[in-house]
């Protein structure tokens, strides 16, 4: 007999609505869940995803200027909200460095629109429903694959990765590290 509940819980920035959201810790770990495919010095795979307004946005749109691409687990969760607001609060510093900021999660465009409006986020949020881009970039998962990873990439004006930063539990550190790198690119 199986008992199912529809309870929701949160764990370090990820919403779980069903017990089936969890993968067994004994499940074999895939190589790409541990090691990033996109590394410093590489050119990441191109993508086109919908933004918070439902418009398609391609990575190639940002060529010619540095871009900060940050992957985060989910909208409206404590760690992700803290990280997004930290990017918002430092947004002028990113603009002064000539950089664009782009956040990517598996949430829908509608969720991103509400999230951006609620927290007055001035940058682009992209919907990677199904986590295709996350997988192509090799963004690692945490906690035996149960938690989508939090990883930040800084691409230079030529689209080459200059920084890969991963810190699941201190989201605000992503801003400090990316700004340091952007200052060194000037």
Swiss-Prot record:
* Active-site residues from the entry: 80
One Pfam family, please name it.
AhpC-TSA
Instruction: Indicate where this protein is primarily found.
Output: plastid
Q: Which CDD domains match?
A: PRX_BCP (cd03017)
Q: Where in the cell is it found?
A: Plastid, Chloroplast thylakoid lumen
Which catalytic reaction applies to this protein?
a hydroperoxide + [thioredoxin]-dithiol = an alcohol + [thioredoxin]-disulfide + H2O
List the molecular function annotations (GO) for this entry: thioredoxin peroxidase activity
Q: InterPro entries in the record, alphabetically?
A: AhpC/TSA, Peroxiredoxin_BCP/PrxQ, Thioredoxin-like_sf, Thioredoxin_domain
Kindly state one GO CC term assigned in the UniProt record: chloroplast thylakoid lumen
For biological process, the GO terms are: cell redox homeostasis; cellular response to oxidative stress
Q: List, for all copies, the residue spans of the domain called Thioredoxin.
A: 38-186
Annotated S-S bridges: 80-85
Q: Mind telling me which Gene3D superfamilies this protein's record contains?
A: Glutaredoxin
Q: Where is this region: Disordered?
A: 33-55
Where exactly is the transit peptide annotated in this entry? 1-36
The catalytic activity of this protein is classed by the Enzyme Commission as 1.11.1.24
Q: Which UniProt keywords apply?
A: Antioxidant, Chloroplast, Disulfide bond, Oxidoreductase, Peroxidase, Plastid, Redox-active center, Thylakoid, Transit peptide
Please report which protein family the annotation says this sequence is part of: Belongs to the peroxiredoxin family. BCP/PrxQ subfamily.
Please describe what this protein does. Answer: Thiol-specific peroxidase that catalyzes the reduction of hydrogen peroxide and organic hydroperoxides to water and alcohols, respectively. Plays a role in cell protection against oxidative stress by detoxifying peroxides.
Q: What else is known?
A: The active site is a conserved redox-active cysteine residue, the peroxidatic cysteine (C(P)), which makes the nucleophilic attack on the peroxide substrate. The peroxide oxidizes the C(P)-SH to cysteine sulfenic acid (C(P)-SOH), which then reacts with another cysteine residue, the resolving cysteine (C(R)), to form a disulfide bridge. The disulfide is subsequently reduced by an appropriate electron donor to complete the catalytic cycle. In this atypical 2-Cys peroxiredoxin, C(R) is present in the same subunit to form an intramolecular disulfide.
Subunit comment: Monomer.
Name the UniProt record assigns to this protein? Peroxiredoxin Q, chloroplastic
Q: Which organism is it from?
A: Sedum lineare
**What is the primary gene name for this protein?**
PRXQ
